[in-house]
């Protein structure tokens, strides 16, 4: 059909796709995935939630974006409340690399009065060295009629949810997508009707989920996660109309050890808070400082060695395109399998089988 052909060829004025589809197509070696790339020429590429670009592939991602701008004459627009540092020297170790050569510029002027005008929340930081356990946290959350609490792991979400009053809603990737969407729809309806609603969630609500709570609790994590969580609080500015601000409480969960990139982000934020009272963390300067510290803690920005595969044999014009295409996987799903879940229509289909 014409619509299917346009989807495969990106032969339309506006194309909506995912980061995975976009970047994996740019590094693909099969004709079926490459035939659409010429349509990127002279286009505007809008990357929503740019902070979600995977750090482990940041080097090849920024390289290909630079090529799109320089050779394809494309314009790249990053949209995010927490813009990472994509230009200059990124990282400090042997994996450090030079980011975008073309400077990233704001499309609007940034002034202190603009930040003041958009101030919608008040951040409350935990006292240094203090922690809270699940029981204490559940008691505190139960004191609110409408509250969102975001924790770092599915296990933490489950443990906290078990201690909450009846009627509390739970969100995590332990649920199938259909169930998640149904719960999000229910949350939005309850908020719209001004009904009591308490939600325990993992960070899946921090990007692309348009919900607005007067109070948000967030387990300690990286600054980008804290700010994204704050974006679910007084999102529409309704409290400002009555002279109030949304309340965001950051807490240290007892006996929690953050690993991987989440742990590196938390370490970078702790370093900033050691010399700051946390009142100016929404500023671009503080965000740049955070990402500089975060990247300095990272071990790799090209875990599949895509640069080596494509440039090692440059002098002999020997490029390992097929291997690079195989290894450039933003989501490693080679060992994954699809399953039919007995939820919603899935239950009916299982009965028919």
What are these regions (language model features)?
Residues 82-142:
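Interdomain hinge/linker at the junction between the two RecA-like core domains of SF2 helicases
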Residues 69, 135-144, 150, 155, ...:
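C-terminal helicase lobe and adjacent C-terminal extensions/tails of nucleic-acid helicase motors
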Residues 11-15, 20, 41-44, 71-77, ...:
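Loop/turn-to-beta-strand initiation segments
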Residues 1-27:
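Inter-Walker segment of RecA-like/P-loop motor cores
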Residues 74, 81-84, 152, 203:
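Conserved H-loop
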Residues 19-23, 31-71:
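SF2 helicase catalytic motif II
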Residues 25, 157-158, 197-213, 228-236:
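SF2 helicase motor core recognition
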